[in-house]
């Protein structure tokens, strides 16, 4: 697959043809999407999905989705036809995939699990696009209701990640511009020099991939990401020690922290999708990419020296090139 082309061409689609999406197709998309993510991770599965494909199942899901509106003051003021229209849109959609992640016993574990399911959802969207299937990633706050949680069987220790509504598209929505990665890019301590020239890990090659990767889904086109590249000097040495990784260079992918918790969660998911795009694109490069979420990124004092701002957080540290081993580090400093 030409990942660059698919990533750039994929669109969020809200209107679908009446052609059904076969269960076998959905199963194949899920299996391949999970495999693509596992190729970069430890293979552990901390997520599950539910498929609403039959008319009865779609009606049931739609009822749970509008339950919060109907029971609210706003719902009592809205015309019945408007609520019926919202329900009809959900029931007419050929299929819905609900994704759920395990919460985890620590913030780091919860983030790792959520990042995994978001990455898999992005893979599903990209793979589906190649088959002519468009999707909409839905996380509206109207889903925050007891009726919806009962319908999807949300358990204690689980977290709702989103719904992928899907169907074959007849018309491709127009493209919406993305901000070039260069405008959200900072280099600390210089570029790669000599350390890995033979592996071609340079700021230029990383930026080329990022300018494709930024075509990730993000609500309201907030583009909540920023990139900090450490290709040499003290910053790269410090990251090698912190990560226990003899990488040629590092890319810190940072998310802006919104005050609104719902936006904050949506933005984190968007950055995870961008990172997944980057990893898929980098698979054709001569240098490997290792996606890590080490413990130190949760300590603001460790993040400050790399230029992470007060209202930002590191979503992942991407180790670029090298073999992943650092003889200067003790085993306890390695990510497990």
Language model regions located:
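N-terminal amphipathic, basic helical "cap/leader" segment at the start of enzyme domains
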Residues: 1-92, 186-249
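Structural motif
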Residues: 94-97, 135, 162, 248-251, ...
């Amino acid at each position: 697959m030409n990942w660059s082309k698919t990533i750039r061409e994929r669109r969020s689609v809200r209107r679908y043809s009446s052609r059904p999406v076969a269960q076998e197709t959905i199963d194949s998309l899920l299996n391949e999407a999970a495999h693509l993510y596992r190729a970069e991770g430890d293979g552990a599965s901390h997520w599950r999905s539910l498929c609403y494909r039959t008319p009865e199942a779609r009606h049931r899901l739609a009822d749970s989705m509008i339950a919060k509106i109907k029971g609210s003051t706003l719902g009592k003021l809205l015309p019945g036809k408007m609520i019926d229209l919202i329900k009809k849109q959900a029931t007419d959609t050929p299929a819905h995939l609900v994704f759920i992640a395990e919460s985890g016993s620590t913030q780091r574990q919860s983030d790792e699990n959520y990042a995994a399911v978001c990455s898999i959802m992005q893979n599903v969207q990209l793979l589906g696009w190649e088959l002519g299937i468009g999707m909409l990633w839905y996380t509206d706050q109207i889903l925050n209701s007891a009726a919806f949680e009962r319908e999807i069987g949300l358990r204690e220790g689980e977290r709702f990640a989103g719904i992928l509504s899907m169907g074959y598209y007849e018309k491709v929505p127009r493209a919406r511009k993305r901000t070039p990665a260069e405008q959200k890019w900072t280099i600390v301590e210089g570029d790669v020099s000599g350390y890995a020239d033979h592996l071609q890990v340079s700021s230029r090659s990383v930026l080329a991939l990022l300018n494709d990767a930024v075509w990730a889904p993000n609500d309201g086109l907030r583009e909540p990401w920023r990139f900090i590249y450490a290709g040499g000097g003290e910053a790269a040495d410090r990251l090698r020690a912190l990560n226990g990784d003899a990488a040629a260079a590092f890319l810190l992918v940072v998310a802006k922290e919104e005050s609104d918790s719902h936006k904050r969660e949506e933005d984190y998911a968007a950055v995870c999708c961008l990172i997944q795009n980057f990893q898929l694109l980098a698979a054709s490069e001569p240098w490997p990419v290792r996606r890590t979420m080490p413990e130190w990124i949760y300590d603001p004092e460790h993040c400050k020296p790399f230029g992470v701002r007060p209202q930002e957080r590191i979503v992942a540290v991407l180790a670029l090139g090298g073999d992943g081993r650092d003889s200067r580090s003790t085993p306890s400093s390695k990510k497990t």
